C-alpha cells in the first residue's frame, strides 16, 4: 500500500510518500505558497502541488493530519483550509482519505502521545532507515503521519471489517430464531 501523507500548512505543507510493504521512503518534501499572494491564490498553488504529488506517486490512500485548536487563529484557519483542499483533491482523485490527530501520530510512532518533535523525528529516521532526519520538521511530520496510518490505520480497517462481519453473522443468527 502506498501512502501519501499531508501535514497541512499554508506557508509550509509537509508531504511524504511511503510504501507500506517495505516500510520505505518513496518521496518527501514541503509544498510552499508565497505569503505575498492573496489567500485564494495561495490555496490554488498548494492545490496544484498536492495534485501533482497525487499524479506522480499514485497513492492508494491519503492521510491528512486532523486540525486541532491552536492559539493562533490565523494559523489554524490556514491549516484547516489546506486540509480541506487536501480532502477535496483526494475525493476528486477517488482516493480514500484517513485523518489522524497529532497525538495519534506521536503515539503510533513513539509509543507516547505527548512525545516531543525531536523524538518523533528520530523514530521516523529509524523506522524508515534514513541516513538523516528530513528537514524541515513539516516533512518529518508528514512521514510520521504516513507511518501512523500504516500501523494504526490498517489495524482500524481490519477491526471495522471484522466488526461488520460479526454483526452480519449475528443478524443472520437472530433471523433464524
Summary of predicted features, one role per range:
Residues 1-177:
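Phosphate- and other anionic-substrate recognition elements at nucleic-acid/protein interfaces
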Amino acid at each position: 500500500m502506498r501512502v501519501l501523507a499531508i501535514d497541512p500548512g499554508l506557508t509550509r505543507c509537509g508531504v511524504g510518500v511511503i510504501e507500506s510493504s517495505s516500510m520505505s521512503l518513496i518521496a518527501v518534501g514541503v509544498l510552499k505558497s508565497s505569503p505575498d499572494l492573496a489567500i485564494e491564490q495561495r490555496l490554488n498553488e498548494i492545490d496544484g502541488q498536492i495534485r501533482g504529488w497525487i499524479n506522480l506517486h499514485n497513492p492508494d490512500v491519503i492521510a491528512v493530519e486532523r486540525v486541532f485548536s491552536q492559539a493562533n487563529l490565523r494559523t489554524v484557519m490556514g491549516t484547516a483550509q489546506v486540509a480541506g483542499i487536501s480532502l477535496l483533491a483526494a475525493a476528486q482523485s477517488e482516493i480514500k482519505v484517513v485523518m489522524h490527530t497529532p497525538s495519534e501520530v506521536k503515539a503510533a510512532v513513539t509509543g507516547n502521545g505527548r512525545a516531543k518533535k525531536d523524538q518523533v523525528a528520530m523514530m521516523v529516521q529509524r523506522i524508515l532507515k534514513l541516513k538523516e532526519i528530513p528537514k524541515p520538521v513539516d516533512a518529518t511530520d508528514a512521514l510520521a503521519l504516513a507511518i501512523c496510518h500504516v500501523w494504526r490505520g490498517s489495524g482500524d480497517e481490519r477491526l471495522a471489517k471484522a466488526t461488520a462481519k460479526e454483526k452480519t453473522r449475528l443478524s443472520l443468527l437472530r433471523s433464524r430464531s
